[in-house]
Amino acid sequence: MGARASVLSGGKLDKWEKIRLRPGGKKKYRLKHIVWASRELERYALNPGLLETSEGCKQIIGQLQPAIQTGTEELRSLYNTVATLYCVHKGIDVKDTKEALEKMEEEQNKSKKKAQQAAADTGNNSQVSQNYPIVQNLQGQMVHQAISPRTLNAWVKVIEEKAFSPEVIPMFSALSEGATPQDLNTMLNTVGGHQAAMQMLKETINEEAAEWDRLHPVHAGPIAPGQMREPRGSDIAGTTSTLQEQIAWMTSNPPIPVGEIYKRWIIVGLNKIVRMYSPVSILDIRQGPKEPFRDYVDRFYKTLRAEQASQDVKNWMTETLLVQNANPDCKTILKALGPQATLEEMMTACQGVGGPSHKARVLAEAMSQATNSVTTAMMQRGNFKGPRKIIKCFNCGKEGHIAKNCRAPRKKGCWRCGKEGHQLKDCTERQANFLGRIWPSHKGRPGNFLQSRPEPTAPPAESFGFGEEITPSQKQEQKDKELYPLTSLKSLFGNDPLSQ
């Protein structure tokens, strides 16, 4: 880390740490941002040592700038960091990243005007391509530098690790900046596997070449002396043209950018391959119930990059589907933010969704709702007994304990009626009859008991055998009539054992 952090020192380091990441924000640049930028440059096969000078930063910006429109957020962050570092090296005072980008744009406009003025002074109104790998040597001739093994190695690693995921396209665009058709074919030939994808790419290139030939027919007649022939589709693809012809077309007046044209054809084919390797539609990207919002956004934008649509359509997809396909928890939060919320605000608001604390809160709310629903259902069915009955002591009459645990002196007599001679279990006060009704004590015994027992007032008449003989059955019937009036319950219970 020490070598990477030594890019700035002294006063430059102080200026660096005073620049804010965003206008009005609290966070400022630190050494860790330079270390991160160095590692990212190594990923893109660029020399991290270029960060030590303003000219090196300018070269890095020239390589990254063409891929900004189609690049990832990491690529844009890297570009912003290098632009800010360039301003620090040049001694330009800036307060934040936005101001550094504006200063950088002003510098580029000034350099373009100077180049145009110099070309006008020399009588050459055309801008000669100075892009790598076509450079101008000391003699003023345009020569070609072969693509470096380091660049090829970076391209092969991307294919091996990412296959043909959407991020392969901006990586290819960055690595092939200013390349000739021969260099582009070298990059494609280094891909060992995925031959089915390579065959699809060849078919797309052939289709684009045929379309070029249809739109640019060959002029009849011989070619004028000192004039170059016009490139055909196969010439642009590098199959029927030499390296010298390709350089001549790219540096002629006016130039024919055969390298850029061929590069566009390859990107069209790569888009088809990416769509084949990523068959998931953006409409199918939905956030799982426990998936963090950050992972959902990553999957969404990765699939969105593979979609073959205009930028306006992609913007509409982002504004609509990103919120619509979120899970219910995040969707509630995102709708509360409003339609003008930025992606940063969305990710900050949904940061805790799906975590342990959020799960506990959701579970507590669900349990509370379930308890309330069960209570409501019980009350509607009439099964709700309400609060439990308060325990009351029979001995002292106080609440909160039972007579077995009572410390007061033992009450004498029955705990129900207060009379002595029997206990509570034998008390006949307020006993229910067979109908479940309480028979008041002042009305005598309950209705299912014999109300009164007839007591004889005179001895029974002796039978001397005179008159009709009374049979035992007749005696029993007569006895029943005396004991049981018409309102008796004998019909229900038979003979009352108390009467025998």
From Swiss-Prot:
Stretches for region Interaction with host PPIA/CYPA and NUP153: 189-227
Positions where Asymmetric dimethylarginine occurs in the chain: 388, 410
Any single Gene Ontology cellular-component annotation: virion membrane
Residues covered by region (Interaction with host AP3D1): 12-19
Motif PTAP/PSAP motif in this chain: 456-459
Region spans: Interaction with membrane phosphatidylinositol 4,5-bisphosphate and RNA: 14-33
Region (Interaction with Gp41): 7-31
Domain comment, as recorded: Late-budding domains (L domains) are short sequence motifs essential for viral particle budding. They recruit proteins of the host ESCRT machinery (Endosomal Sorting Complex Required for Transport) or ESCRT-associated proteins. p6-gag contains two L domains: a PTAP/PSAP motif, which interacts with the UEV domain of TSG101 and a LYPX(n)L motif which interacts with PDCD6IP/AIP1.
Name assigned to this protein: Gag polyprotein
Phylogenetic lineage: Viruses, Riboviria, Pararnavirae, Artverviricota, Revtraviricetes
